[in-house]
Amino acid sequence: MAIFDIEKDELLRLSDIQLEELIARLAEAEVAMHGHSPACVNWSGSITAPDGGIDIHVQVPIDQLKAGFLVRPDTVFQAKKHKMPKSAIEREIGTGKALSPIISEQARKQGSYIIVSLGDDCSPSGKKDRLKAMRDAVKDDPNESYLHLDFYDRSKLIQWLRQHPSVMLWVKAKLGQGYSGWQPYGAWSNPPQGVIDTLISAPGVTITLPSGKGQKLKIDEAINPMRALIRSTNKAVRITGLSGVGKTRIVQALFDETVGTDALDRTVAIYVDTGYEPVPSATAMLDNLLAEGRRAIMILDNCPSELHASLASKVSAAGKEVSLITIEYDIRDDKPQTTEVIHIETDGPDVAEQLLIRRFPSIGQNNARRIAEFADGNARVALAIAERVEEGESLALLSDAQLFNRLFEQRNHPDGHLREQAEILSLVYSFSISSPDAATDELEILGVLSGYPKIQLFKAVTKLMERHIVQKRSHWRAI
């Protein structure tokens, strides 16, 4: 089966609320495809209530829409999990003087009313009968000739779903068929559950754009130009910066309508952290999107330089249907003819301090400031230290060396050999622990230089990863 496909009968396993959310997400994607905000779609309430209430309401502020799965700019969707024969249709929308006021209002506004029935998979004659039942029910309304009516069965719903890859990722995840690692728009920076995840725009993080002649912008100054660049270029966009500067959260903000103006279309966003070896691979996913001509913005976090270069060439050659954003801590040999590079860096502790107070409110302002200063604004390091602060403890009198010991030892007994091995591993920018294609064994070379056997260094790497001191990118590791 193709990546962006699903058996239509699998949708029967959706709950009532999931069905309503699916239709809402599809409506948002359809509205966004027409160049309007997904905020034009509203949905809430009980899907099972037979009261003619509105499940999903689309209100696009224009006079006419280009025909598609949405025909009128004002459209009401009624979502039903069960079958909807003629008798059920009449009960749902009423007839004559008992006609639902929702239907009458849609007719008055020359809008559209669509029943989506998951339980039905109609033949052409079956759909015709249901549409006739809907039309007969409204025939006595004075504005009935202005009302657009339609009936979407399971086949129509799956046809609509196939047009929107990001929504397909969502529904597959709900059905337990999600692809390993791939996600639609969401909290990609993975904040702890229950923690506020609004973007921190404090001074201390600067962003340099490729056309900015080296000018360093604040986050709130850079968001809109970043969006404009991603929309206009046919090149891949590479977001670089040291670990802990907030690259992923800033990319997430590009799709957030509450940040800046004219947000990127979140309904076409497809995200994956390549460090977790996704299935399908990033290459296979891009090839599929390009082959099917799907509009998508593909975000690859922790994307190695080699993978970026390979995919950037494909995106540049294909045009603008698929936009590619990759995130990584370095740039290396990215080719300017296929890549726009945006660099993010920290200058000061302010953002890290605010993040600590948000994540660990009991830590106190003074401790948060001390940790952020020690970490030199690096949020990843700051969070690792803050996790080990005891209730009521003060760090004011701890030296930098003592704070480093706390970060490194993490309540384990001091281990001079492990620290020495970490120092050896930190001499290089990064190192490979296993690469069948490599001409040299990098861990073996580091072992020769240090006097430690390769297996001992390998074990050290494993321990350091458990302490979140080593980062992982495929077979690459870095202190």
Give residue spans per PLM region:
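Winged-helix-like regulatory helical subdomains adjacent to P-loop NTPase cores
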Residues: 87, 91-106, 120, 170-224, ...
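Short capping/hinge segments at domain boundaries that bridge a core fold to an adjacent linker or tail
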Residues: 81, 245-255, 297, 441, ...
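Post-Walker A helix-loop "phosphate-sensing" segment adjacent to the P-loop in P-loop NTPases
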Residues: 35-36, 256-268
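Amphipathic alpha-helical "lid/sensor" segments that cap RecA-like P-loop NTPase cores
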Residues: 244, 250-251, 332, 336-340, ...
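Sensor-1/coupling segment of RecA-like P-loop NTPase cores
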Residues: 121-124, 304-311, 315-342
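Conserved P-loop NTPase "ATPase switch" module shared by AAA+ and STAND
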Residues: 268-318
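Mixed-charge (Asp/Glu-Lys/Arg
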Residues: 1-204
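Hydrophobic anchor at the beta1->P-loop junction of P-loop NTPases
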Residues: 239
